[in-house]
Amino acid sequence: MIRSQLKELLDRCFQEGVDNGSWSDRGAGKYTVELPKHEGQGDFSTNIALVLAGIEKRNPRELAGIVAEKLGLETAIVAGVEIAGPGFVNITIQPAVWHGVLAEVFSAGENFGRSQVGAGRKVMVEFVSANPTGPLSIGHGRQAILGDSIARLLEATNHDVFREYYYNNAGRQMRVLGESTRARYLELIGAEFSFPEDGYQGEYIIDIAQSLVDEHGEKLKDEPDVEPFKDQAEKAIFKDISGTLERMGIHFDNYYNERSLYENGHIDSVVQELRDKGLVYEKDDAVWFETTKLGQEKDRVIIKSTGEPTYRLPDIAYHREKFKRNFDWLIDIFGSDHIATVPDVLSGVEALGYDASKVTVLLHQFVTLTRDGKQVKMSTRKANFVTVDELIDVVGEDVLRFFYMLRKADSQLEFDLDLATSQSQDNPVYYVQYAHARLCSILAQSGERGIVPAEVGSSLLQRLQEPEELALLKTLSGFPAAIEGSALDLAPHKFIHYLMEFAGQFHSYYNKHKVITEDLELSQARLCLIQALQLTLQNGLHIIGLTAPKSM
């Protein structure tokens, strides 16, 4: 795109300076071309003079003057150059160059915005990984959309993405689930029962227990083993979770079974390997991981005195199995409640001889629902918390997905139900999707009137000179970079805000200028722009899993 053209131009300018002795070659590749932070500072800005000044020990504005003079000669691309502040060089691009963006959009078509920056790099994204002990909560929902959106953006930048759900079906919480189900089963058949003090509440447990009554009657009344109850509950809850994920448009390439870590001896082998390295000791009938030797503040229990592993041990074993599958990049998406265990797990990975720098852990904050500015708790039959399914029933899949991406992962997310259900321009989802519907409507109207968009390369495109038109072309030009930046930063919120800015610019243009006018040539030029905007916005919505409605 235009930024890369400008970077090539700047590289030539730099090399000319090296060749004629203006500066040394030590600054090669160290300068950047960025969008300016404020309006009125050109279309792009470069720090080349500041970088060279630090290396050459010279005045940055003097060097900026040399750069500006060289760039000013490139009149086919550059319309103007200005030195700003301590030595930034601000560059304004010729309008005709912006018109060339339209050719790039139509040439790439549905692939416009996608790039090869990932170069086929193998990436595993682990997300959701909720225990099969109940329906997905709104907190799980945020993680599900965050993980899926990151995976989609990485795929759009040519990363080979593998989505995995770590299926936590071992340990204490599963036993408690079985005990809770058995208690409800006994209650339903009129037998004596004692509900676990920390048991799982909610109607869903009663529903599972009822299915056992329907299938077995009272035959399980004296069953001493909790396994039949646990297995029935696990199957029912996994089916429920799978249905919720399907509603959200999320699929996984693999569900990794935690129980397999025990059955295949991976837990024991990790303990033995750490023991062989002198990193494990016994104290108070528990097994400790000596993480202080690895730079942590204190040692951690990995096997309790009861013989039950803590979360850290299976997590270390699971990450070892991830590394064995030869991914180039491992991305873990967890709730912020994992913050204490992450350093210990990564220390364990390093201790086992793996490169923990290949692991990126993204922690997200929690979600609160609000109505009329106050936190609310929706009434729920299924559980003692709000489920994702219930939220989808209220706001729909697109709104759910969009709102979950609005904020940085590490920011608390306030989900405003009033805003989410309103059909007004205050609702960001409506605002963006309505922009697409408007674009489609304009194209449909032009078709009915027999007005054909100008062809790419036509001199008619020179009619696109309004400031709002040039601004839209600049935004189109930034579409691939918006995808790439959001993908590599693991930051879907950045792309969402790009789409909101895109929609805002179009709505402003639509309100100020008629696309179809009495001037046929101007109408054709503007329709070419509208066509490119529609295709690009459609691509953007589809890349992050949103629909692009043609009418609203």
UniProtKB/Swiss-Prot annotation:
Keywords: Aminoacyl-tRNA synthetase, ATP-binding, Cytoplasm, Ligase, Nucleotide-binding, Protein biosynthesis. It comes from the Bacteria. It is found in: Cytoplasm. GO terms for cellular component: cytoplasm. It catalyses: tRNA(Arg) + L-arginine + ATP = L-arginyl-tRNA(Arg) + AMP + diphosphate. InterPro entries: Arg-tRNA-ligase, Arg-tRNA-synth_N, Arg-tRNA-synth_N_sf, ArgRS_core, DALR_anticod-bd, Rossmann-like_a/b/a_fold, tRNAsynth_Ia_anticodon-bd. It holds the Pfam family Arg_tRNA_synt_N. One of its GO terms (molecular function) is ATP binding. Its EC number is 6.1.1.19. CDD domains: ArgRS_core. One of its GO terms (biological process) is arginyl-tRNA aminoacylation. A motif ('HIGH' region) lies at residues 130-140. The keyword Flavoprotein does not apply. HAMAP family: Arg_tRNA_synth (MF_00123). PANTHER family: ARGININE--TRNA LIGASE, CYTOPLASMIC, ARGINYL-TRNA SYNTHETASE. Belongs to the class-I aminoacyl-tRNA synthetase family. Monomer. This is Arginine--tRNA ligase. It comes from Desulfotalea psychrophila (strain LSv54 / DSM 12343).
